[in-house]
Amino acid sequence: MSDKKLSDNERLKTQSNYLRGTIQDDLADPLTGGFVADNFQLIRFHGMYQQDDRDIRQERIAQKLEPLHTVMLRVRLPGGIITPHQWLGIDAFAREHTLYGSIRITNRQTVQLHGVLKDDIKPVHKLLNHLGLDSRATAGDVNRNVLCTANPVESVLHRQSWEWAKKISEHLLPRTNAYAEVWLDKEKIIQPDDEPILGKSYLPRKFKTAVVIPPQNDVDIHANDLSFVAIGDGDQLVGFNVLMGGGLAMTQGDTSTYPRLATEFGFIPLAHTLAIAEAVVSTQRDWGNRENRRNAKTKYTLERVGADVFKAEVERRSGVTFSPLKPYVFSERGDRIGWVEGIDGKYHLTLFIPSGRLLDKPGLPNKSGIAAIARVHNGDFRLTANQNIIIAGVASDDKAQIDALARQYGLLDSSLSSQRKDSMACVSFPTCPLAMAEAERVLPDVVSQIEHLLHKYGVGDESFVFRITGCPNGCGRAMLAEVGLIGRAVGRYSLYIGGNREGTRIPRLYKDNIDVPTLFDEIEKLIALWAKERNIGEGFGDFVIRAKIIMPVINAPVDFHTAV
C-alpha cells in the first residue's frame, strides 16, 4: 500500500462495522425515501443500488420534491439456476410491490427488480430468504454473481460445472452477519466479525468470476476478472484452465482506463479450484489500487505488477503450481433459441427475451407467460448470459404443454431474426444513474434499422454481434461486440468495430461522438462493403480487420487509445 490518500470508498468500508453502517437508521427515517451519506454506497454490498426515475426527475425538482428514490435489487443466482417456485415468488413481488412491475434478466445470469420503494425493501429480502435465496454480494467491492455456461445439451458436464460455480460463489461470499441483521431482523451474533478472504476493507473494486464450458463463450470470459474454462474427459469434468484480468469498463477521456482481454495462467485439477480462487482474490485484495477507483480493477493490477508476478504470487499463496494449458476453443456465444434434446433424454426450451425484460405488454405478455410455464414445469429455469431463459429438464410427456404455453404467450416467434438474437443492451434510462444515452429502450428500433440494411444489401440472413451500452462502464459488454455503441450524450454514441463472433477480440473506436443519423450512415457503408467484398463465411468483425477499415486491438493497454 502506498502513502497516497485512499479513496473515500476505503474509509466508508473500513468504518462501516462490516457493512452495517447506519442503514437501520435510514430505514426508519420517514423524511426521505432514500439512503444518505455512506449508506448510499453500503447498500450495494447487500445487492442494491439506489436509483430514481430520470424521466420525471426535473418535474419533481420543479415541484420541490426529492427524486423518486427506489432501489434496484439483484438476486444472487450462481450459474443462473432458479426453481419455478422461486420464480413465482419473485414474479408476484415484482407485480405487486415494484413501480414498474417487471423482471429484468441480466447478462450476469440473475434477475433485477427495479422500482422497489423503501418500505418494501425488508419484505423483499425476507421473501428471498423464505425462497432460499438472497442478494448478498451482487453489487459492491466483492465477488459478484458467478456465471456458468447455460449449456442445455451437455447436461452432465453442465451440472458438474454449475456445482463448482456455486461452490466458488459460497466460498468467496462476505462472512459478516450484517445482511441477516439488517434485512432479516436476526439478532447480532456475539462472536466478532471476521473477513478472512475479503478483509475488513473488502476488495478495491468489484470482482467478476465465470465458469465457461467450451465451445460456448456465452459468459464472455474476457469480461471477467477470473475465469475457469471447464476441461472435460468425455462427460466428466477434470479441471479448469484459469484466466485472469479481463474487464471492459473504462472512463470517457481517461486513457489510463481501457478494456482488457484476460491472461491465461494455466491448468489446475478440480481439487485446487477453491484454493486458486481464494489466492487470486486475496492477491487482488492486497495489491489492488485503493487510491484511484478508476484503476482499481484486477486488470490494472496485472498491468502494473506484471502478469507473471501476479501469477507467481497466486501460486505462492495457494500452494498450487499451474500446469500448462489444456487445449480449448470457442466457436459461438449466442443461445440456441428453441427446443434441444439433452444427452439425458430431457428437453430444453430456450426462449428469447428482448433485453431480458419481462413485462406484460399488448400482444406480448411475456412475464405472465413465464409464470404460466412455472406453474406446470417440473424442471428448473436457467437464465443465460445473453439475457434469455431456458426451460430446462422437460420430460417428453410435458413437452407439448410447455410448447403450447410458450406459443400462447408469444414467447416462441418463428420470425425472430439472427440479428435480433445477436443484439444486447444495458438498462440505461430511465433508472440507471450513470446513463448518458439510451440503450434498452432504443434497441428494438435500432435492430430493425440494421435488419433493413442487411436485407437491402442481400445479407438479410446474416448477422453480427451488436451491443449498446448507455455509458462506458461496460454493463452491455459492447467492448466484446463486432459492432458496439457506447453512449456519449442523449442521441449521441461512439461507434466501435472489429470485435469477433467468439468474443476474443476487443473492437476499436471507428467514429467518436456521432449523432444517430450519422451513426446509421456509417453502419450502412460498412454493411454495404461487407456484403460486397467479404470472403465466404467471413464475419463482419473479421472483415473490417482484413479489409483494413480498422486496425485490430492487439494489446489494449498499449494500443486501444492509439489513433489508427
From Swiss-Prot:
One Pfam family this sequence matches: NIR_SIR_ferr
Q: Which GO cellular component terms, listed alphabetically, does the Swiss-Prot or TrEMBL entry include?
A: sulfite reductase complex (NADPH)
Which residues does the record give as [4Fe-4S] cluster binding sites? 426, 432, 471, 475
- Cited PROSITE patterns: NIR_SIR (PS00365)
Q: Name one GO biological process term.
A: hydrogen sulfide biosynthetic process
Q: Which family does it belong to?
A: Belongs to the nitrite and sulfite reductase 4Fe-4S domain family.
Q: What protein name does the entry list?
A: Sulfite reductase [NADPH] hemoprotein beta-component 1
